[in-house]
């Protein structure tokens, strides 16, 4: 990936991130079309723990959001990954992977682990795996995965920030 810069979002990036996210999920069969609104609600609630953009030739071509999650109603130091958006013309080219790896690298010293809801075939390459004792309501267990950095794996029901449900 030549000449791609990954950096935290700035306030000036918000509109481009929204447009990118809408385009990235436009034809995704698993999408309900609310990903851009989720990011906007997380931003408005000051709940984006980390929001990274990938820039090439002055344009945002990718974005990854990370926000706190609760387990059993408690903040145990875990974070949730998502949404992750890549421009349709750049998908399957490593941009999303680069954003995820950078975000995980930045968070692993300050958080205990990360959750993701998504394709196990994709997210396993980053170390995500189904973790017994952790649940996320309404999804098949194989699509809800964790990556643990510190301590014993927690148990309980995981909840993303309320911005994910409106």
Segments predicted by a language model, with ranges:
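Conserved acetyl-CoA-binding loop-helix of GNAT-fold acetyltransferases
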Residues: 81, 86, 92-105
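C-terminal "cap" of GNAT-fold acetyltransferases
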Residues: 115, 136-166
């Amino acid at each position: 990936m030549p000449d791609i810069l990954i950096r935290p979002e700035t306030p000036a990036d918000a509109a481009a991130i929204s447009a990118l996210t809408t385009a990235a999920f436009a034809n995704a069969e698993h999408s309900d079309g609310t990903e851009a609104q989720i990011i906007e609600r997380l931003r408005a609630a000051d709940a984006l723990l980390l929001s990274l953009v990938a820039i090439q030739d002055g344009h945002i071509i990718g974005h990854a959001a990370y926000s706190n999650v609760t387990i059993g109603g408690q903040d145990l130091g875990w974070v949730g990954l998502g949404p992750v958006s890549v421009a349709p013309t750049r998908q399957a080219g490593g941009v999303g992977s680069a954003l995820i790896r950078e975000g995980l690298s930045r968070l692993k010293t300050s958080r205990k682990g990360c959750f993701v809801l998504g394709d196990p075939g994709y997210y396993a390459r980053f170390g995500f795996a189904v973790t017994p004792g952790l649940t996320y309501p309404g999804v098949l267990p194989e699509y809800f995965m964790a990556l643990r950095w510190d301590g014993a794996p927690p148990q309980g029901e995981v909840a993303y920030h309320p911005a994910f449900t409106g």
